[in-house]
Amino acid sequence: MKSNLKHQSNDPNCKGVEILSIGTELLLGNIVNTNAQWISEELSTLGLNHFRQSTIGDNSERISKLIKEISSRSNLLITTGGLGPTPDDLTTEAIAKSFNATLSERGYLWDQIKKKLSISGSNFDRSSLKKQCFFPKDAQIINNPRGTAPGMIWKPIEGFTILTFPGVPSEMKEMWKETAVNYIKSNFSDGYIFFSNTLKFSGIGESTISEKINNLLKLKNPTVAPYANLGEVKLRLTARAKNELEARKIINPVKEKLKKEFSKFIFGEDDDNLSSVLIKELLKRKESLVFAESCTGGLLSSSITSIPGSSQVFKGSIISYSNNLKQSLLSVPENLIKKFGAVSEEVAETMAINAKEKLNSDWSIAISGIAGPSGGNKEKPVGLVYISIAGPNGHLTNIKKIFSSTRNRIEIQRLSVNVCLNSFRLILLSSSK
């Protein structure tokens, strides 16, 4: 019988799906737990909600106790980590212990491991690697095409199933796609999926957006959820439907309403970022772009060159961090720097105009500021940034921003890049070629 997890998800007392990440290295912060995030997205795609994530260290007693607790409140548990050959790989043994089960050797798995290692030319220790061949007798094995640690699908008690995967992301993902997806669809899906479409905003805060769309935040299908990142806000629209086409039909009316309300602030969707959007627009306009950077030290250039195809529109950048280079490379007069300071509208404007001319570009963006933590004063505090954008037909836009002094150096630099790119986006949006 299928476990109709999603159908029951509106019941606060219902059972559901849990993710358990196993490994002391996760608790110590030695590695980032990307597996749980990836599996969460996969579960949503399959139409399943998971209600809890846990992380636990490599301790058999604690793992066993937690799994027993999970079995009383969930239908499906997905674990990652602890399937390797070392003494601290304890997942399978701990799971078996939770249900007083014994482990038996699967001889064919040992043959597979030896074959894989002989092909790769690796030496192997029989005593350590062989522990990966022991499973509960009625467990279904999940083959590992990329490594030596198989996983399993096991139903130790009625109404509770465990899927185990290694902690190596590349191995886990391939095993998931080859085995877990079909198994979950066949045994736990009610035929519905979750589909999400994310709108991305810049130049407006999360609280302002939330105030304006308070009624939309109460919707049940689709749901509307805001998320704030440094310099941008995301609105995730999620619908539950039989397929993606139906889900889009549910989402689209809400999306169009949001686009009408926030047309100036929405710069893209899903995988878009400000750099990719700007590159597409410049390609369409057949225009080029250069930078003259000071306080961002190349971060602005990096944001553009990280996008494939950027070389078709981005010519390069002059990183004039010192005053001497501002003078020698960008022809900023020494007396201008002495009179107004390197961090000033006048200097940023001169940097932009001269960079555009020297590098023969349609557009240029220049930035000079105080990223901190030192270097500021009462008149020019840490967080002060001047941006100048020069373009065709004598276009010139000057921008002054003062970011909070509570921001650290990297945050001020990243926010400065965001303001540069978003300001340029708005200029392109308002000008037609």
UniProtKB/Swiss-Prot annotation:
Tell me the organism. Answer: Prochlorococcus marinus subsp. pastoris (strain CCMP1986 / NIES-2087 / MED4)
Q: Which family does it belong to?
A: Belongs to the CinA family.
Instruction: Please state what the protein is called.
Output: CinA-like protein
Q: Record's Pfam families? A: CinA (PF02464), CinA_KH (PF18146), MoCF_biosynth (PF00994)
Source taxon at top rank: Bacteria
CDD domains in the record, alphabetically?
cinA
Which InterPro entries does the record associate with it? CinA, CinA-like_C, CinA_C, CinA_KH, Competence-induced_CinA, MoaB/Mog-like_dom_sf, MoaB/Mog_dom
Checking NCBIfam families in the record gives: cinA_nterm, molyb_syn, PncC_domain, PRK00549.1
Entry-linked Gene3D superfamilies? 3.30.70.2860, CinA-like (3.90.950.20), MoaB/Mog-like domain (3.40.980.10)
Lineage of this protein's species? Bacteria, Bacillati, Cyanobacteriota, Cyanophyceae, Synechococcales
